[in-house]
Regions:
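H-loop/switch region of ABC-family ATPase nucleotide-binding domains
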Residues: 203-204
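Conserved ABC ATPase "signature" region
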Residues: 105, 120-138
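H-loop (His-switch) and adjacent beta-strand-loop-beta switch element
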Residues: 216-228
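Helix-to-loop junction immediately C-terminal to a conserved catalytic motif
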Residues: 56
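Catalytic Walker B motif of ABC-type/P-loop ATPase nucleotide-binding domains
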Residues: 167-171
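ABC ATPase nucleotide-binding domains
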Residues: 230-267
């Protein structure tokens, strides 16, 4: 529930976006309130990443408005509340020697400590972020020696160290095993419930979104579904949505990973 008199982290009204002369997002309207864990799903080319990049101001809209914490023209003080973790953020080359703690410290870097001189407050932010991510036991390990799930938590902790309140995640579940996936999802749920963070996560993994997020949005140029994650239509019903078919590998089970495929262009 939205706290009275405080604007929501995100409010989008009648947003449309073109890319390469093609309409990718059409008439998108939604509000995401504080403390929500929202899963954004849809086919390749459906506009998910385009939506995130437009929120961040990296792409221009054709029409419509985006408000972050009540601001259409977002000041730096509000930008500091936004944490962005791209799909490839955890793909750190093995020849780069950096520990978990050093990676998380990057989240606090600014003009006052660009030479890695951290105040007591900044060190406290780093310690808190590492604790929230459950990485205390590996904070001095090289990031390349961690599991895929631990690396994802580390890059999210970097965003937390900057005091981000609204975290945007692009495909954080790609390339990690089931146990790491479940651990990461529990961590994200904890951030919402205990730390009152707001999360918007893009994923192709519908089963994971249904199990973990509070709300699911199905985006394919337009919003096709916006509601409780556990009330989302069954995978068999996805064939009724234009250009979509459910695809799975392996044996049928409740925990099976599903992806959405489309013949459309990549987003």
């Amino acid at each position: 529930m939205q706290i009275a008199d405080k604007p929501p982290p995100l409010k989008v009204d009648k947003l449309s976006v073109n890319r390469s002369g093609q309409l990718v997002l059409d008439d998108i309207s939604l509000t995401i309130n504080r403390g929500e864990f929202v899963g954004l799903v849809g086919p390749n080319g459906g506009g998910k990443t385009t939506f995130l990049l437009t929120i961040l101001g990296l792409l221009k809209s054709k029409s419509g408005t985006i408000e972050l914490y009540g601001h259409k023209k977002v000041p730096n003080s509000i930008l500091g509340k936004i944490g962005w973790v791209s799909q490839h953020a955890s793909n750190i080359p093995k020849n780069i020697k950096i520990t978990v703690k050093e990676l998380v410290q990057l989240g606090t870097l600014n003009s006052s400590n660009m030479f890695w001189r951290f105040s007591a407050e900044q060190n406290q932010q780093v310690s808190k972020a590492i604790e929230l991510a459950g990485l205390q036991s590996v904070e001095n390990k090289n990031i390349s020696n961690l599991s895929g799930g631990q690396r994802q938590r580390a890059v999210i902790a970097r965003a937390l160290a900057s005091n981000a309140e609204f975290i945007l995640l692009d495909e954080p579940l790609v390339g990690i095993d089931r146990d790491s996936r479940n651990s990461l999802l529990k961590f994200l749920d904890k951030l919402c419930h205990e730390a009152q963070k707001t999360i918007l996560m893009v994923s192709h993994d519908i089963a994971a979104i249904q199990q973990s997020s509070h709300r699911m949005i199905f985006l394919e140029e337009r919003i096709r579904y916006d509601g409780a994650a556990d009330c989302f239509p069954s995978l068999a019903d996805l064939a009724n949505l234009r250009g979509i078919k459910p695809v799975h590998d392996g044996i049928d089970s409740p925990d099976e990973l599903y992806q959405l495929e489309s013949m459309g262009d990549k987003e």
